[in-house]
Regions:
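Nucleotidyltransferase catalytic core that binds NTPs
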Residues: 1-210
């Protein structure tokens, strides 16, 4: 039986940017399926204000995906948005990506027959040790199944930290990551900067949604 390599990519998507899409397309080249998971937990945890509604986020993401030559390898999963209809505010506030990862593995692993990987940017990886249950995330994924996008803000492989995880024998060891770069045009692009320069992004967004 063929084992599919499925890469999970969680992001707040507020907004989803060309840099996000460049990451997704790079992951498509080495995975069978890439699952984009727009998340909601950051807003509850950090007290942030949403810029785009859930529906707007999905519209933007799907517009990017529909224009991609890898559209057939990409799934947009609104799992976290659907949680709003089932969970209370307090329950949502206690959600972390660890919980979503478990949900996604149950949904896509096909009882362990598929290989589940995860992709994050180097800026997120730098702070990965502060994530809720980060060590359990590494344990669940297994060694060498975390993909980190480098090159942003001068970040190189040598500057990335090393985290520990429990291997299959229950011994603590260094976790090995995979790294790759995206086009230099997108290396300094971030949702935060785009929100600060809304008018410039809106022109690009109008072209995407056209």
């Amino acid at each position: 039986m063929y084992i599919k390599k499925i890469c999970l990519f969680g992001c707040t998507a507020d907004p989803f940017t060309p840099a996000h899409m460049a990451m997704v397309e790079a992951a498509c080249k080495i995975h069978d399926i890439v699952v984009i998971i727009p998340t909601i937990v950051d807003y509850y945890r950090a007290g942030k204000t949403k810029w785009l509604s859930d529906d707007q986020k999905l519209e933007v993401i799907n517009a990017f995906v529909n224009k991609s030559k890898f559209w057939h390898k990409i799934i947009v999963d609104d799992h976290e948005f659907q949680l709003r209809t089932r969970l209370s505010f307090e329950q949502l506030a206690n959600r972390r990506f660890y919980h979503t990862l478990n949900d996604m593995i149950s949904k896509y692993s096909e009882n362990g027959m598929n290989e589940i990987c995860m992709m994050i940017g180097s800026d997120s990886y730098i702070n990965f040790g502060t994530w809720y249950a980060y060590d359990k995330i590494l344990n669940i994924l297994g060694d060498n199944r975390l993909y980190v996008v480098t090159g942003r803000n001068g970040m190189t492989n040598e500057l990335l930290p090393t985290y520990k995880f429990l291997n299959e024998n229950g011994k603590l060891q260094d976790y090995h990551i995979n790294t790759f770069k995206i086009d230099d045009r997108f290396k300094d692009m971030s949702a935060t900067k785009i929100r600060a320069k809304y008018s410039d992004y809106k022109t690009y967004l109008d072209d995407v949604l056209d």
